[in-house]
Amino acid sequence: MEIRGILFKRLFLSFGQRAFVTSTVPTTKLFINGKFVESSASKWIDVHNPATNEVVTRVPICPKEEMEEAVASAKAAFKSWSNTSILTRQQTMFHYQSLIKKNMKRLAESITEEQGKTLVDAEGDVFRGLQVVEHACSVTSLQLGESLPSIAQNMDIHSYRIPLGVCAGVTPFNFPAMIPLWMFPLALVCGNTFVLKPSERDPGASMILMELLKEAGVPDGVVNVIHGQHEAVTFICEHPDIKAISFVGSDQAGKYIYERGSKNGKRVQSNMGAKNHGVVMPDANKEHTLNQVSRDQFLTTGLWMKITQVE
């Protein structure tokens, strides 16, 4: 009886702990007007740690009202941000670059926990995104216009690069830091505002990047984050206040976004699924070649544009 009592107690504690953990799983917030906001969503997606299957966070399927609020916030912020000195925007990117470097390990750990790639690969994910932020710091040369004097009598031509307005980005799950960093830093430094929809499967890195962006001094509303699936993508493609969309991901989603967005008069860049070619030369080391090709099939579960796909 005593042994059974002990076993029962252990089982009870075990089930009790599991129930407690389940009820206290953190939720992924929205980022609207410079604040991390709890969603009022009725539908949520569980994000699992691929190594342990533990639920690490719950991601909301945002209702339309919250997505509208994010776009309205970006639109309101555009008025002042687009008129901010280009040197001020550049200094903000310098500060942001420094903060990402300091928090690289934290970002990598979040990626590994949610997405599953190794810490080394996760740090590479952050580093490649950081390089784009560094490029954004050269905005003073990126924003140069053009001039052509004397094209006719008493006539010169000058062209200027001006911000578009509210831009949006839809990013995939395989590079949770790198691909968002391909998008919003360049949009911001050129005077645009931004609405980001990260992958609902691993949004943690994007939320940390928002925290660092706020610390870098970017004004409230300049960048906003929403969460969701197909409905959120359609919302971005159809909202009249969103002027441009950047997408990286699968062929099916990319074609949908390109067709739907351009039909509504938006500038769309759609980087769809791709793979590298592999050419095996006659003098190649066969063992090394097989190891490399086999390795590619498992990196990021095979979903990486750089790898060679075997069919």
Locate each region found by the language model:
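ALDH superfamily catalytic-core signature
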Residues: Q252-E311
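Terminal low-complexity tails and localization/encapsulation signals of metabolic enzymes
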Residues: E2-R58, Q91, H95, G145-T171, ...
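Glycine-rich loop-to-alpha-helix module at the N-terminal edge of alpha/beta enzyme cores
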Residues: E54-L144, N154
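Conserved small-residue-rich beta-alpha loop and adjacent elements
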Residues: E146-D220
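Active-site pre-lysine segment of PLP-dependent enzymes
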Residues: S206-E215, H230-D241, Q252-K263, V279-E287
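A structured beta-alpha segment of the ubiquitous adenosine-cofactor-binding alpha/beta core
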Residues: D156-I157, N224-S246
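Residue-level signal for inorganic ion chemistry
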Residues: N53, R89, I111, V133, ...
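Short beta->alpha connector loops at strand-helix junctions that form conserved
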Residues: N192, K197-S199, H227, V248, ...
